[in-house]
């Protein structure tokens, strides 16, 4: 049981110590130099905008958004708002194919910026973007049809978290049933084929992103609507278990491609913090990935892939936040997570 949290700074290192009743202290080092390097990498959005790399841009903004929520510092908010201002000024939102699901990826970053700054221009951008959900084309199974006509569980990450966030904040929750209905439809149609695919590398990549989509969607929903939350939790746990059933465990993450291991670690850490997974059972599986991110080389190596940088930042944010999850609900009306 968590007894206390001590937060202090020594030289350039911010240290968060959690003390448990069994007198075990877990220390998370937040190195200011590492975070400076991370912001420098993540703020490089100009090339993503000019190349119209919408998926990478959305992933980058998701990473900056996650860091704002985890660190709650002016430097994080500044990095996010500067990136979003470039997005707005570039006009890329208007030039994106509106039939492409990935153009919704940037939506939640606008909401985060609005929450931290109080500036309605970011909220207005989110609402304007969400208007595209109303008449978006659907496939025969009933979920949104992407511009390329390809079906993949991984595509939920492009739009479901933002769809849920919009409905929670500005849509009156009128389409909550559609959000879960789309998850139901794609899960029924695609999950089994993905889980039992002989292409282990491909299915791990898909399932890791799908798990991240589910846990991100759960985070932004009204927690009081338990039936929908529980259904998504079931899908989330099944996805995590399907990845582990490929034979991956503490010693086998070297078999993952780097993006998959990072996304899986992010999903597991977030699932533990939100009590969708049992921390004692699952957290230890991904701590090696956390150590790799905390070492900082990902954020200083000039050859690091742009999406690896973003996903590493997602892991960093949850590594910090996950240490506080057991203190959930205090001062927040009994919320399951914060």
Feature-to-residue mapping (PLM):
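Extended ligand-binding clefts on enzyme/binding-domain cores
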Residues: 153-157, 161-265, 277, 281-296
């Amino acid at each position: 049981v968590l007894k206390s949290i001590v937060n202090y700074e020594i030289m350039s290192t911010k240290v968060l110590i959690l003390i448990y009743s069994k007198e075990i202290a877990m220390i998370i080092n937040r190195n200011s130099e590492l975070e400076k390097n991370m912001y420098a990498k993540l703020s490089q959005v100009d090339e993503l905008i000019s190349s119209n790399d919408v998926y990478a841009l959305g992933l980058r903004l998701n990473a900056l958004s996650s860091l704002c929520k985890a660190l709650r510092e002016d430097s994080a908010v500044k990095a996010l708002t500067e990136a979003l201002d470039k997005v707005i000024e570039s006009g890329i939102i208007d030039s994106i194919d509106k039939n492409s699901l990935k153009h919704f990826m940037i939506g939640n970053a606008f909401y985060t910026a609005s929450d931290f700054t109080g500036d309605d221009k970011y909220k207005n951008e989110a609402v304007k973007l969400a208007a595209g959900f109303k008449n978006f084309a659907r496939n025969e199974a009933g979920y949104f049809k992407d511009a390329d006509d390809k079906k993949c569980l991984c595509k939920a990450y492009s739009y479901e978290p933002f769809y849920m966030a919009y409905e929670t904040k500005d849509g009156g929750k009128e389409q909550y049933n559609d959000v879960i209905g789309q998850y139901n439809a794609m899960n029924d149609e695609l999950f089994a084929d993905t889980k039992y695919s002989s292409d282990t590398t491909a299915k791990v990549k898909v399932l890791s992103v799908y798990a991240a989509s589910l846990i991100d969607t759960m985070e932004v929903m009204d927690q009081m609507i338990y039936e929908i939350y529980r259904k998504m939790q079931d899908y989330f746990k099944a996805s995590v278990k399907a990845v582990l059933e490929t034979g991956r465990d503490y010693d086998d993450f070297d078999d993952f491609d780097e993006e998959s291991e990072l996304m899986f670690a992010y999903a597991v850490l977030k699932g533990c913090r939100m009590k969708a997974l049992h921390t004692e059972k699952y957290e230890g599986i991904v701590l090696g990935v956390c150590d790799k991110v905390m070492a900082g080389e990902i954020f200083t190596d000039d050859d690091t892939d742009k999406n690896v940088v973003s996903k590493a930042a997602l892991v960093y944010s949850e590594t910090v936040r996950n240490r506080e999850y057991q203190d959930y609900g205090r001062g927040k009306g009994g919320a399951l997570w914060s």
